[in-house]
Amino acid sequence: MLLMILGMTIITVSILVNQITKDTFNKNNPNLDVIVGAKGSPLQLVLSSIHHIDIPTGNISYKNAKNIIKHPAIKFGVPISLGDNFQNFRIVGTEKKFFKLYNAQIETGSIWRKPMQSVIGFNVANSTKLKIDKFFVGSHGLIDTGDVHAEQPYKVVGVLKKTGTILDNLIITSLDSVWLLHSNKNDIKNSRDSLEVTALLLKYKNKTSAFSFPRLINRNTNMQAASPNLEISKLFKLTGEAYKAINYLSILIVSLSFVGILFTLLNNISERRYDLAILRTLGFSKEKIFSIILIEGMTISFLGSFIGLIFGGIVYKSIEYFSLLGKNIIAGQFELI
């Protein structure tokens, strides 16, 4: 029975994690067609720019970013700038139209009006206890171990309603805010062409541009263009084999548990011959005695499966809870291994 419980627990957790992870990746992509960023791993670019899991591949010129947004193939484009965090929640420098991607709505406060003001996601507000008009300082890097920018604190001016996407775990501010902390102030005042951003989130006017636009960027610039849907499909193709292996192992464990239950029943029959003989003398037929033994085995199997399903749900919820505490989220920011 213990093997049955173990096998069903593993199967339940595997199925839940696999399905929830797929749903989460789908929800976190607001129908973006392509991401443009520094050359490197396309998957890394997608994970860092949309799902905010991996580290960025580097920075690109803000001047080039503006030119790409003006390209005839592009319907919508917004730059983002990464590099800092607060208590492991990433700080994203961007433009106000970024919120349109997620149909985000302000619950309290408003969107920033000047640099060093920020809007925080639903989970950020709950976890950090930040409120409107409160100040906080970001840490350099994407985990909460870097140098603190104590000289330039952020002010919370808005809190977003819950979206069920990665936006709930982000701190959103203006590009100017990020540049003030990492660039020369004279460059911001005089000319922004020398400044940099991390990536561009883009939508096409026409889906046929998916064939020509990435090739144009990848061949003719020092940047790369990556398709979110394509890269995530590749990712799940790779991880799918691991899930299959886990499920096969679970099925093997469950099968062994059935064999174990069978041997247990046979052993019980041998040990309970006297009891069975009494049943025979009381008028029980062989078929009825066999059905009693069969029901006993099915009951053990059912209980093992049921307990395994319950344990699987408990294990999954525990993983989800502790993942949320660590900001490596199954429901928004799943930490890949």
Model region roles, listed by residue range:
Residues 85-96, 104-185:
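Hydrophobic secondary-structure segments that place a key small or acidic residue at a functional site
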Residues 1-12, 23, 285, 294:
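N-terminal Sec/SRP start-transfer signal
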Residues 15-90, 100, 114, 213-215, ...:
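Hydrophobic, regular-secondary-structure patches
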Residues 17, 21, 25, 238, ...:
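Juxtamembrane alpha-helical signal-transduction segment immediately C-terminal to a transmembrane helix
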Residues 251-256, 266-268, 274-319:
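Transmembrane alpha-helical interface segments in multi-pass membrane proteins
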Residues 310-314, 324-337:
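Conserved transmembrane alpha-helices of multi-pass membrane proteins
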Residues 2, 244-264:
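Internal alpha-helical transmembrane segments of multipass membrane proteins
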Residues 148-153, 159-243:
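Mechanotransmission and gating elements of multispan inner-membrane complexes involved in transport
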